[in-house]
Amino acid sequence: MSKISGTLEWAVANANCITGCRHDCVYCFARYNACERFKNVEMGDWPKEKVNWKNAKKRWSKIDGTIMFPTTHDITPNEGELKTLDASIECLKNILKPGNDVLIVSKPHIECITKICKELAVYKDKVLFRFTIGAMDNEILKHWEPNAPSFGERFDCLQHAFKAGFKTSVSSEPMLDSDGVIQMFDMLEPYVTDAIWIGKMNNVRQRVKVQTAADKKYVDMIVKGQTDARIREIYETLKDDPKVRWKESFKTVLGLELAEEAGTDK
């Protein structure tokens, strides 16, 4: 039986409509694949987003299981003639129109989430937001996710979607600050209707280049914060909370049963 990991833990299919991502996250698998592994894009060009309108306008049929959007970019505000938010909303509407269930995953901008909640209100029962929040410390976030929103803005987005009546969840994969993860869980949990996922930063030594003292500091922090012993400590603290979920990277360490079917979101 093939291993169920990554996005397949959450969804059976995915959709994207933008190339590149202005957030330029240091650990990003899509950035690594495009710029390092396959060398399709220069590293300096990755933050220069380009809309794929063919994908945005694609007509979807109904499928069994959840569709995740996006997986290789994020949902970012329009910038002049670069209509990334408009493209994302058009793509989402086309997925939702046939009755599909959609998981929207983002390091969210309040401008984007406010508009998405308004535009997709009629599809509310088919949408689950999953906001990526790996730490509360903005210094840590700024190092790993240099152009993504602050913790405060992401927290505002979570509260906005929750108060607008949408289903909400959080992904703390990668967990960027293991020392603060319990406090963050407790702070976010009241605004989460679904679950808070916690997972390791995968392939950190492979994907992250250590070129400065700051790079070394933060890589060492990640490695120290996701040892087997630390993972077990976090598990023991949170295991009885009904809203906690463990990604495959944690389950492997903990000896928990792995997903056997794509898109079970468990």
Which positions does each model-derived feature cover?
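Short aromatic-enriched loop/helix-cap "lid" or pocket-rim segments at secondary-structure transitions
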Residues: 27, 208-211, 257-259
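Conserved AdoMet/S-adenosylmethionine-binding subsite of the radical SAM
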Residues: 52-237
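N-terminal [4Fe-4S]-dependent radical SAM core
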Residues: 1-66, 253
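Functionally engaged cysteine thiol sites
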Residues: 17, 21, 87, 247
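Short linear functional motifs in flexible/disordered or boundary regions
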Residues: 33, 37-40, 81, 116, ...
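C-terminal accessory regions of radical SAM enzymes
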Residues: 229-266
